[in-house]
Amino acid sequence: MKTETIKCRTLMVSDWCCDQHGFPMQITNVGDDYAYATFEGNEGDPWEFDDKDDQPHPIILTPEILEKNGWYFGLTSDEEDAEYSLGGCHYDRHWTYDEGAGSISLIFPNDADGGELIIDDQSFNRHLNLVFCDTLHVHELQRTLRLCGLNELADNFKV
């Protein structure tokens, strides 16, 4: 059985990935064909991934990981009456992260992989929708949060 892997150069510092056994690690350094990662209790002796022999693997984003990072299942009060659809499908899994002046919604459709990440930041009068098509992995959510200017939230993510 072939498992999904990540090219080292596509990772960023603070991204979460795992080894071939599923052990979670956080990236500390990235090169063209290698990446260093560390895990709790082993900060002084980093693990080396490479694109040839020991490739990093993605960590699937789960409800438990979202809850550990302050996300909650359901809609914000502003969204309770709204109906979400994308391409005619309705969503059955909606996760929200409130950051005071705005909220972040992660929405999964009930009949297909993929979904939508909505940033509603009222403090900057900004509303941003990002659509993803595949199963969302932790490092992909981290990257998306960084692209939206939410570096602290992305870099302090826990698995």
Report each predicted region and the residues it spans.
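Amphipathic, interaction-prone secondary-structure segments
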Residues: F73-A112
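Short acidic/polar mixed-charge low-complexity motifs
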Residues: H21-P24, D45, G102
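Intrinsically disordered, low-complexity regulatory segments enriched in Ser/Thr/Pro
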Residues: A101-T135
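Short beta-strand-centered aromatic/proline hotspots
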Residues: W16, G22-D33
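Mixed-charge, Lys/Arg-rich low-complexity intrinsically disordered regions
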Residues: M1-L11
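Basic/aromatic-rich interaction segments and small domains that mediate binding to polyanionic partners
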Residues: T28-D51
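Intrinsically disordered, low-complexity, charged/polar segments
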Residues: E43-Y72, H127-F157
